[in-house]
Amino acid sequence: MRLLAVLISVLWLCCQPAQAQVRNYDEMIAAGELKVAVYKDFAPYSFESAGKPQGVDVELAEALAKALGVRLSLIWAPAGEKLDDDLRDYIWRASALHNQQLADLMMRVPYDHDYAQKRNELGELVNGQVVMFGPYQNEQWQVAYDRRRLDKVASVAVFEQHPIGVEVDSVPSFYLTSVFNGMLAGKTHHYPGVPQAFAAMKAGEVDAVMAMRGEIDWQVHETADPQVALAENAYPNMGKQLWEIGMAVHESNRQLAYAVEEALEGLIREGAVKTIYGHYGLRYDVPEMYQ
Protein backbone atom coordinates (compact mmCIF):
# COMPACT_ATOMS: atom_id res chain seq x y z
CA MET A 1 0.00 0.00 0.00
CA ARG A 2 2.84 2.35 0.84
CA LEU A 3 4.53 1.68 -2.53
CA LEU A 4 1.22 2.25 -4.32
CA ALA A 5 0.80 5.59 -2.56
CA VAL A 6 4.30 6.65 -3.62
CA LEU A 7 3.62 5.64 -7.24
CA ILE A 8 0.34 7.57 -7.27
CA SER A 9 2.11 10.65 -5.88
CA VAL A 10 4.83 10.43 -8.54
CA LEU A 11 2.26 10.03 -11.32
CA TRP A 12 0.27 12.98 -9.98
CA LEU A 13 3.34 15.20 -9.95
CA CYS A 14 4.27 14.13 -13.46
CA CYS A 15 0.85 15.13 -14.72
CA GLN A 16 1.08 18.66 -13.35
CA PRO A 17 1.92 21.45 -15.82
CA ALA A 18 5.48 22.69 -15.62
CA GLN A 19 5.85 25.75 -13.41
CA ALA A 20 6.81 28.80 -15.42
CA GLN A 21 10.18 30.29 -14.50
CA VAL A 22 10.97 33.98 -14.12
CA ARG A 23 13.58 35.00 -16.70
CA ASN A 24 16.39 37.29 -15.64
CA TYR A 25 17.56 40.23 -17.73
CA ASP A 26 20.41 38.37 -19.43
CA GLU A 27 18.09 35.52 -20.44
CA MET A 28 15.59 37.98 -21.88
CA ILE A 29 18.29 39.75 -23.92
CA ALA A 30 19.70 36.41 -25.12
CA ALA A 31 16.24 35.34 -26.25
CA GLY A 32 15.86 38.63 -28.10
CA GLU A 33 12.31 38.96 -26.83
CA LEU A 34 10.50 41.05 -24.21
CA LYS A 35 7.29 39.42 -22.98
CA VAL A 36 4.84 42.12 -21.92
CA ALA A 37 1.45 41.58 -20.30
CA VAL A 38 -1.26 44.04 -21.35
CA TYR A 39 -4.93 43.99 -20.47
CA LYS A 40 -7.21 42.40 -23.03
CA ASP A 41 -9.98 44.46 -24.65
CA PHE A 42 -9.07 47.62 -22.73
CA ALA A 43 -9.23 50.48 -25.23
CA PRO A 44 -7.56 52.88 -25.63
CA TYR A 45 -4.67 51.14 -23.89
CA SER A 46 -4.55 47.62 -25.29
CA PHE A 47 -6.97 46.08 -27.76
CA GLU A 48 -7.16 44.53 -31.21
CA SER A 49 -8.67 46.13 -34.29
CA ALA A 50 -8.96 44.07 -37.48
CA GLY A 51 -6.68 41.52 -35.85
CA LYS A 52 -3.93 44.06 -35.18
CA PRO A 53 -2.75 44.94 -31.64
CA GLN A 54 -3.34 48.61 -30.89
CA GLY A 55 -3.41 51.01 -27.97
CA VAL A 56 -1.22 53.27 -25.88
CA ASP A 57 0.28 50.43 -23.83
CA VAL A 58 0.92 48.32 -26.93
CA GLU A 59 2.76 51.15 -28.71
CA LEU A 60 4.71 52.06 -25.59
CA ALA A 61 5.70 48.42 -25.05
CA GLU A 62 6.89 48.30 -28.67
CA ALA A 63 8.98 51.43 -28.15
CA LEU A 64 10.50 50.04 -24.94
CA ALA A 65 11.36 46.72 -26.59
CA LYS A 66 12.99 48.57 -29.48
CA ALA A 67 15.03 50.66 -27.04
CA LEU A 68 16.25 47.44 -25.39
CA GLY A 69 17.14 45.98 -28.78
CA VAL A 70 14.66 43.10 -28.64
CA ARG A 71 11.32 42.22 -30.23
CA LEU A 72 8.01 42.52 -28.43
CA SER A 73 5.86 39.51 -27.51
CA LEU A 74 2.44 40.42 -26.09
CA ILE A 75 0.58 38.43 -23.46
CA TRP A 76 -3.10 39.39 -23.47
CA ALA A 77 -4.29 39.41 -19.87
CA PRO A 78 -8.01 39.27 -19.06
CA ALA A 79 -8.51 41.48 -16.01
CA GLY A 80 -8.93 39.50 -12.80
CA GLU A 81 -11.11 40.41 -9.86
CA LYS A 82 -8.17 42.14 -8.16
CA LEU A 83 -4.88 43.59 -9.35
CA ASP A 84 -3.13 41.36 -6.80
CA ASP A 85 -4.41 38.34 -8.76
CA ASP A 86 -3.12 39.76 -12.06
CA LEU A 87 0.34 40.40 -10.64
CA ARG A 88 0.46 36.88 -9.23
CA ASP A 89 -0.73 35.25 -12.45
CA TYR A 90 1.48 37.17 -14.88
CA ILE A 91 4.55 38.28 -12.91
CA TRP A 92 5.53 35.85 -10.18
CA ARG A 93 3.62 32.55 -10.04
CA ALA A 94 1.72 32.02 -13.30
CA SER A 95 -1.60 30.24 -13.59
CA ALA A 96 -2.80 27.11 -15.35
CA LEU A 97 -5.85 29.13 -16.39
CA HIS A 98 -3.54 31.34 -18.45
CA ASN A 99 -1.32 28.59 -19.91
CA GLN A 100 1.39 29.13 -17.29
CA GLN A 101 2.54 32.28 -19.09
CA LEU A 102 4.80 34.65 -17.18
CA ALA A 103 5.55 38.13 -18.49
CA ASP A 104 8.87 39.90 -18.08
CA LEU A 105 6.99 43.17 -17.72
CA MET A 106 3.39 44.17 -16.99
CA MET A 107 1.85 47.46 -18.07
CA ARG A 108 -0.81 49.62 -16.34
CA VAL A 109 0.06 48.98 -12.71
CA PRO A 110 -0.52 51.69 -10.09
CA TYR A 111 2.64 53.53 -9.07
CA ASP A 112 1.51 53.98 -5.49
CA HIS A 113 3.54 53.58 -2.29
CA ASP A 114 0.58 52.61 -0.13
CA TYR A 115 -0.50 49.91 -2.57
CA ALA A 116 3.06 48.57 -2.91
CA GLN A 117 3.30 48.32 0.89
CA LYS A 118 -0.09 46.67 1.39
CA ARG A 119 0.04 43.78 3.87
CA ASN A 120 -2.19 40.80 4.57
CA GLU A 121 -3.64 39.69 7.91
CA LEU A 122 -0.30 38.06 8.80
CA GLY A 123 1.61 41.28 8.25
CA GLU A 124 3.22 40.01 5.03
CA LEU A 125 3.55 42.14 1.92
CA VAL A 126 0.77 41.13 -0.47
CA ASN A 127 2.94 41.93 -3.49
CA GLY A 128 6.35 41.28 -1.98
CA GLN A 129 7.50 39.45 -5.10
CA VAL A 130 6.76 42.40 -7.36
CA VAL A 131 8.57 45.67 -8.05
CA MET A 132 6.31 48.50 -9.23
CA PHE A 133 8.18 51.26 -11.01
CA GLY A 134 8.30 53.57 -14.02
CA PRO A 135 5.28 55.91 -13.80
CA TYR A 136 4.32 56.83 -17.35
CA GLN A 137 0.83 58.30 -17.00
CA ASN A 138 -1.16 60.54 -14.68
CA GLU A 139 -4.80 59.47 -14.37
CA GLN A 140 -7.85 61.13 -12.86
CA TRP A 141 -11.65 61.19 -13.04
CA GLN A 142 -13.43 63.03 -15.83
CA VAL A 143 -16.99 63.87 -16.88
CA ALA A 144 -18.01 64.34 -20.52
CA TYR A 145 -21.41 65.83 -21.30
CA ASP A 146 -23.68 66.65 -24.23
CA ARG A 147 -24.11 70.42 -24.60
CA ARG A 148 -27.41 69.92 -26.41
CA ARG A 149 -28.97 68.85 -23.12
CA LEU A 150 -26.67 70.29 -20.48
CA ASP A 151 -25.22 73.81 -20.61
CA LYS A 152 -22.32 73.16 -18.24
CA VAL A 153 -21.23 71.06 -15.27
CA ALA A 154 -20.38 73.54 -12.54
CA SER A 155 -20.80 70.85 -9.90
CA VAL A 156 -21.75 67.18 -9.71
CA ALA A 157 -24.92 68.46 -8.05
CA VAL A 158 -26.38 68.98 -11.56
CA PHE A 159 -26.76 65.20 -11.72
CA GLU A 160 -29.63 65.39 -9.29
CA GLN A 161 -31.64 66.58 -12.31
CA HIS A 162 -29.64 65.30 -15.30
CA PRO A 163 -29.01 61.56 -15.86
CA ILE A 164 -25.38 60.43 -15.97
CA GLY A 165 -23.92 57.11 -17.16
CA VAL A 166 -21.22 55.10 -15.37
CA GLU A 167 -19.67 51.66 -15.63
CA VAL A 168 -21.27 49.18 -13.24
CA ASP A 169 -19.26 48.44 -10.05
CA SER A 170 -16.82 51.28 -10.81
CA VAL A 171 -15.56 54.04 -8.52
CA PRO A 172 -17.79 56.63 -10.28
CA SER A 173 -20.76 54.32 -9.67
CA PHE A 174 -20.09 54.08 -5.94
CA TYR A 175 -19.31 57.79 -5.73
CA LEU A 176 -22.39 59.12 -7.52
CA THR A 177 -24.77 56.82 -5.69
CA SER A 178 -23.43 57.80 -2.26
CA VAL A 179 -22.28 61.45 -2.37
CA PHE A 180 -24.62 64.08 -0.93
CA ASN A 181 -26.42 61.37 1.05
CA GLY A 182 -27.36 59.52 -2.14
CA MET A 183 -29.23 62.42 -3.74
CA LEU A 184 -27.68 61.63 -7.17
CA ALA A 185 -28.42 57.89 -7.08
CA GLY A 186 -31.76 58.17 -8.85
CA LYS A 187 -30.18 59.75 -11.93
CA THR A 188 -27.13 57.46 -12.06
CA HIS A 189 -27.49 54.90 -14.87
CA HIS A 190 -25.26 51.82 -15.00
CA TYR A 191 -23.76 50.18 -18.11
CA PRO A 192 -21.40 47.24 -18.77
CA GLY A 193 -18.61 49.60 -19.81
CA VAL A 194 -17.68 53.14 -20.79
CA PRO A 195 -18.37 52.60 -24.53
CA GLN A 196 -21.94 51.53 -23.70
CA ALA A 197 -22.38 54.58 -21.46
CA PHE A 198 -21.25 56.83 -24.32
CA ALA A 199 -23.63 55.08 -26.70
CA ALA A 200 -26.40 55.79 -24.20
CA MET A 201 -25.43 59.47 -24.16
CA LYS A 202 -25.53 59.55 -27.95
CA ALA A 203 -29.00 57.95 -27.84
CA GLY A 204 -30.22 60.54 -25.32
CA GLU A 205 -30.62 58.14 -22.39
CA VAL A 206 -28.12 60.11 -20.30
CA ASP A 207 -26.72 63.63 -20.55
CA ALA A 208 -23.20 62.86 -19.31
CA VAL A 209 -20.70 60.07 -18.57
CA MET A 210 -18.13 59.79 -15.79
CA ALA A 211 -15.04 57.56 -16.04
CA MET A 212 -11.25 57.70 -16.02
CA ARG A 213 -9.89 60.57 -18.09
CA GLY A 214 -8.09 58.36 -20.58
CA GLU A 215 -11.23 56.38 -21.38
CA ILE A 216 -13.27 59.59 -21.66
CA ASP A 217 -10.68 61.20 -23.98
CA TRP A 218 -10.75 58.11 -26.21
CA GLN A 219 -14.53 58.06 -26.45
CA VAL A 220 -14.66 61.79 -27.20
CA HIS A 221 -12.01 61.25 -29.88
CA GLU A 222 -13.94 58.36 -31.42
CA THR A 223 -17.30 60.15 -31.21
CA ALA A 224 -15.91 63.24 -32.98
CA ASP A 225 -18.99 65.24 -31.96
CA PRO A 226 -18.30 68.95 -31.25
CA GLN A 227 -21.30 69.03 -28.92
CA VAL A 228 -19.65 66.56 -26.52
CA ALA A 229 -17.60 68.58 -24.04
CA LEU A 230 -15.25 67.90 -21.12
CA ALA A 231 -16.30 69.17 -17.70
CA GLU A 232 -13.92 70.91 -15.29
CA ASN A 233 -15.86 70.30 -12.08
CA ALA A 234 -14.50 69.12 -8.73
CA TYR A 235 -15.49 65.88 -6.97
CA PRO A 236 -16.18 66.69 -3.31
CA ASN A 237 -15.71 63.93 -0.74
CA MET A 238 -14.22 61.57 -3.31
CA GLY A 239 -10.84 60.91 -1.74
CA LYS A 240 -7.89 60.27 -4.06
CA GLN A 241 -8.58 61.90 -7.42
CA LEU A 242 -5.17 61.85 -9.11
CA TRP A 243 -2.83 58.86 -9.37
CA GLU A 244 0.06 57.55 -11.45
CA ILE A 245 0.21 54.48 -13.68
CA GLY A 246 3.42 52.53 -14.08
CA MET A 247 4.77 49.02 -14.69
CA ALA A 248 5.78 45.91 -12.76
CA VAL A 249 8.47 43.21 -12.90
CA HIS A 250 9.40 40.31 -10.61
CA GLU A 251 11.36 41.49 -7.57
CA SER A 252 14.36 39.42 -8.70
CA ASN A 253 14.43 41.26 -12.02
CA ARG A 254 15.40 44.76 -10.94
CA GLN A 255 18.02 44.96 -13.70
CA LEU A 256 15.19 44.87 -16.24
CA ALA A 257 13.31 47.53 -14.28
CA TYR A 258 16.35 49.83 -14.35
CA ALA A 259 16.82 49.32 -18.10
CA VAL A 260 13.14 49.89 -18.87
CA GLU A 261 12.97 52.99 -16.66
CA GLU A 262 16.00 54.49 -18.40
CA ALA A 263 14.43 53.81 -21.80
CA LEU A 264 11.09 55.23 -20.63
CA GLU A 265 12.65 58.46 -19.40
CA GLY A 266 14.28 58.96 -22.79
CA LEU A 267 10.98 58.39 -24.59
CA ILE A 268 9.17 60.83 -22.29
CA ARG A 269 11.78 63.57 -22.61
CA GLU A 270 11.96 63.35 -26.40
CA GLY A 271 8.15 63.58 -26.65
CA ALA A 272 7.60 60.07 -28.02
CA VAL A 273 5.20 59.07 -25.23
CA LYS A 274 3.10 62.21 -25.72
CA THR A 275 2.92 61.40 -29.43
CA ILE A 276 1.69 57.87 -28.68
CA TYR A 277 -1.08 59.25 -26.48
CA GLY A 278 -2.01 61.70 -29.22
CA HIS A 279 -2.62 58.81 -31.63
CA TYR A 280 -5.69 57.95 -29.53
CA GLY A 281 -6.86 61.47 -28.72
CA LEU A 282 -5.54 61.37 -25.14
CA ARG A 283 -4.12 64.32 -23.26
CA TYR A 284 -0.71 63.68 -21.75
CA ASP A 285 0.79 65.13 -18.57
CA VAL A 286 4.39 64.26 -17.75
CA PRO A 287 4.57 62.38 -14.41
CA GLU A 288 6.17 64.29 -11.55
CA MET A 289 9.29 62.08 -11.53
CA TYR A 290 10.34 63.41 -14.95
CA GLN A 291 9.46 67.08 -14.51
Residue ranges and their predicted role:
Residues 40, 136-144, 213, 221-261, ...:
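Periplasmic-binding protein-like
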Residues 38, 54-67, 138-183, 189-192, ...:
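Bilobed "Venus flytrap"/periplasmic-binding protein-like clamshell domains
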Residues 25, 58-67, 147-150, 162-163, ...:
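Extended ligand-binding regions for polar small-molecule ligands
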Residues 64, 91, 159, 200-202, ...:
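Hydrophobic residues within well-ordered alpha-helices
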Residues 109-124, 175-179, 202-203, 207-241:
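A ligand-binding cleft/hinge motif common to bilobed small-molecule-binding domains
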Residues 74-156:
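Acidic, polar ligand-binding/catalytic clefts
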Residues 21-109:
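Extracytoplasmic small-molecule ligand-binding "clamshell" domains
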